[in-house]
């Protein structure tokens, strides 16, 4: 099974990234010109499929001895595996945003889901690198994140959301509300069912930029205050790129 081994920036890994990009293009081509209701049903259906796949993936982790040894010395805890992180919370935010046509939610998912999922695909933790894609732990990790990239980008390619700088304040508000909500869930779980709960990494994380933030503001939740500034800069850059692309498409051929 070595030929299916997934290591960042090696053959199978690069092929997976290529297939992810191809899936975005294929969905666009298949649904281009189709009624909005059909496009909506399709995207929501893909999201629900991914949510079911995510549930199966997490169930497989509860039976994975290597994963449990690495992350749960006191035993597996499903309450630390819920889809409430910055990336996988979009498993249900994307279909909710499409169903309600909520630009704040769709905007958040468009900007955050592909970025967060792509970072997970490009820079996996050691236990998710160098193993066969046929292992449930590896298959679930890479495929669920790849589909998140596809669904997040499809919000734009299928016409549900076009990046607009006027949306950014509302998206930042959505981000803030989700972060506070995640922290409250962390507090509740730490007092009851899951002492290590750390959704949205509100208690810090061994990630370079987050460790830097913690050194600046060593307080749970509050240490992430610089994050909205970085997110805003990223969103404004994407909006500017989108506007340039739109102008190029609208320009008459000379």
What are these regions (language model features)?
Residues 31-44, 99-107, 158-169:
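Membrane-interface helix-boundary motifs at transmembrane edges
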Residues 58-70, 122-132:
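Juxtamembrane "helix-exit" motif on the non-cytosolic side of transmembrane helices
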Residues 4-19, 171, 177, 192-235:
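Membrane-interface transmembrane-helix boundary segments in multi-pass integral membrane proteins
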Residues 98-156:
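Membrane-proximal helix-loop-helix units in multi-pass membrane proteins
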Residues 69-83, 130-143:
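Non-cytosolic membrane-interface motifs at loop->transmembrane helix junctions
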Residues 14-33, 47-59, 179-183, 228-240:
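Hydrophobic core of alpha-helical transmembrane segments in multi-pass integral membrane proteins
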Residues 23-30, 93-94, 147-166:
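Alpha-helical transmembrane segments in multipass membrane proteins, preferentially the mid-helix core
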Residues 50-59, 113-125, 175-187:
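Aromatic-anchored segments of alpha-helical transmembrane domains
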């Amino acid at each position: 099974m070595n030929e299916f081994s997934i290591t960042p920036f090696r053959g199978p890994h690069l092929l997976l990234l290529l297939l992810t990009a191809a899936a975005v293009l294929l969905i666009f081509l298949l649904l281009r010109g189709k009624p909005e209701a059909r496009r909506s049903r399709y995207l929501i259906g893909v999201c629900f499929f991914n949510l079911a796949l995510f549930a199966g993936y997490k169930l497989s982790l509860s039976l994975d001895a290597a994963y449990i040894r690495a992350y749960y010395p006191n035993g597996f805890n499903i309450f630390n595996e819920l889809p409430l992180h910055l990336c996988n919370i979009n498993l249900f935010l994307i279909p909710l945003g499409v169903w309600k046509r909520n630009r704040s939610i769709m905007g958040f998912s468009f900007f955050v889901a592909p970025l967060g999922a792509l970072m997970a695909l490009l820079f996996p933790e050691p236990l998710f690198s160098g193993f066969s894609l046929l292992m449930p732990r590896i298959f679930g990790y890479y495929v669920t994140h790849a589909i998140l990239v596809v669904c997040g980008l499809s919000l734009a390619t299928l016409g549900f959301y076009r990046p607009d700088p006027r949306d950014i304040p509302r998206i930042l508000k959505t981000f803030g509300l989700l972060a506070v909500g995640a922290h409250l869930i962390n507090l509740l779980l730490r007092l009851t069912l899951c002492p290590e709960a750390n959704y949205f990494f509100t208690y810090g994380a061994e990630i370079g930029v987050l460790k830097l933030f913690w050194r600046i503001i060593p307080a749970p939740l509050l240490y992430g205050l610089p994050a909205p500034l970085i997110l805003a800069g990223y969103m404004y850059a994407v909006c500017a790129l989108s506007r340039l692309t739109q102008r190029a498409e609208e320009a008459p051929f000379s």
